[in-house]
């Protein structure tokens, strides 16, 4: 694709990056076949190729409009197009650059601005989000259906964690909304790691990974989140922690980008690369310990009936982190019978705050995904990202859990025996 960027961006780092990405696109259109919004709306401008043309026009000096902004807003950033693209177009980075420019040039209506301010004020702050969520859960039965669906039900679960007792240690990203919505998830991960001889150590000062602010075009706040985490984790990594582990693939995909996003920061560039290098999804950690894990699971699952489970692979897991088939293998080893899921590459519609900002499209995508997931009559739906988990649960009766909780449940007899001996 030939380009002629405007003076305002041509010689900037973002301009050079955007120019390189634009030139790698060959207009083939393969991306449209796997784009969820294009499949729903059938509009070229609501697919990756059309959005690339819109961004190119803006970066070449064209005046963006509210319609331009709408088409960019409708993108889920699911990155299925990147998996499909034969030319390796780094679409999500071009979208980040384009959205930031359009955000500066197009003033949003007051209602949109207030909603985004509220999201930025509450969701990245666990100390504020969790109590507000509890209040919402208390009054949830009294709310009208559409509003009630947006508030996840309170989930019972074991949130007890083992003490740090092993020489092998990892840091765990706790997240911002996950501790409030599903506190049992990280606790389950800590117990599974403990059974494998790995302790999770506390890192006070860490918080939101930065993805939420970043994708709402609050770039400065996102970078501040990232730097705070780097400062919190650096002492543990320097002292021998083996990884920064995340149980939410959306967070993990953002951690993987720390090195890239802070590459031009003289103070943090090197440390950001270290965090990205040490970033591991919990599935990757368990895969590295698969021999020991499988041996434990063989003891605890022998003779137990296999439970039918549908696995939803979040976009951030399969397209962002490029982890495919790994969780399914671990679940099978834990005694689960996986049911087939059609169109597994498509997004469920959660996409961070997308379900709040684009509720109609999000709901359609969720319902389509639930139809595919429940077609095999599973007893449970498992996933790997808190946003997907809450979003899918809001639309159906089949329980939706994080897959690590199923591993924890399968290992429970072995862990109880081990603890009784210590």
Located regions from the model:
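Short His/Asp/Glu-rich catalytic/ion-coordination signatures at enzyme active sites or charged loops
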Residues: 60, 80, 84, 217
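Non-heme iron-sulfur electron-transfer modules
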Residues: 1-10, 37-70, 88-117, 401-407
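Generic N-terminal leader/targeting and pre-domain segments
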Residues: 1-28
């Amino acid at each position: 694709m030939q380009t002629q960027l405007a003076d305002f961006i041509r010689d900037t780092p973002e301009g050079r990056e955007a120019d390189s990405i634009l030139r790698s696109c060959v207009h083939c259109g393969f991306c449209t076949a796997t784009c969820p919004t294009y499949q729903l709306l059938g509009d070229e401008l609501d697919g990756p190729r059309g959005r690339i043309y819109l961004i190119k026009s803006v970066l070449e000096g064209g005046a963006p409009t509210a319609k331009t902004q709408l088409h960019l807003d409708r993108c889920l950033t699911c990155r299925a197009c990147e998996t499909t693209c034969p030319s390796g177009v780094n679409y999500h980075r071009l979208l980040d650059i384009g959205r930031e420019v359009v955000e500066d040039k197009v003033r949003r209506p007051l209602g949109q601005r207030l909603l985004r301010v509220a999201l930025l004020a509450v969701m990245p702050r666990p100390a504020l989000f969790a109590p507000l969520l509890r209040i919402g859960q208390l009054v949830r039965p009294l709310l009208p259906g559409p509003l009630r669906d947006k508030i996840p039900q309170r989930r019972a679960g074991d949130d007890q964690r083992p003490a740090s007792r092993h020489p092998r240690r990892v840091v765990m990203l706790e997240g911002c909304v996950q501790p409030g919505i599903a506190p049992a998830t990280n606790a389950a991960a800590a117990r599974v790691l403990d059974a494998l001889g790995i302790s999770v150590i506390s890192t006070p000062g860490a918080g939101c990974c930065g993805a939420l602010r970043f994708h709402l075009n609050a770039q400065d706040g996102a970078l501040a989140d990232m730097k705070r985490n780097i400062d919190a984790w650096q002492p543990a990594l320097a002292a021998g922690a083996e990884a920064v582990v995340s149980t939410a693939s959306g967070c993990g995909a953002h951690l993987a980008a720390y090195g890239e996003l802070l590459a031009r920061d003289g103070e943090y560039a090197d440390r950001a690369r270290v965090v990205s290098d040490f970033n591991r999804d919990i599935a990757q950690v368990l895969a590295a310990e698969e021999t020991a894990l499988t041996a434990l699971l063989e003891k605890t699952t022998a003779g137990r009936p296999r439970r039918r489970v549908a696995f939803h692979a979040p976009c951030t897991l399969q397209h962002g982190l490029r982890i495919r088939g790994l969780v399914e293998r671990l679940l099978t080893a834990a005694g689960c019978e996986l049911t087939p899921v059609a169109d597994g590459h498509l997004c469920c519609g959660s996409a961070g705050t997308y379900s709040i900002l684009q509720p109609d499209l999000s709901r359609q995508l969720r319902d389509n995904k639930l139809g595919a997931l429940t077609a095999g009559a599973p007893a449970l739906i498992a996933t790997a990202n808190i946003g997907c988990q809450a979003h899918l649960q809001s639309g159906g009766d089949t329980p939706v859990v994080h897959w690590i909780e199923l591993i924890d449940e399968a290992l429970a007899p072995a862990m109880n025996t081990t603890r009784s001996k210590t």
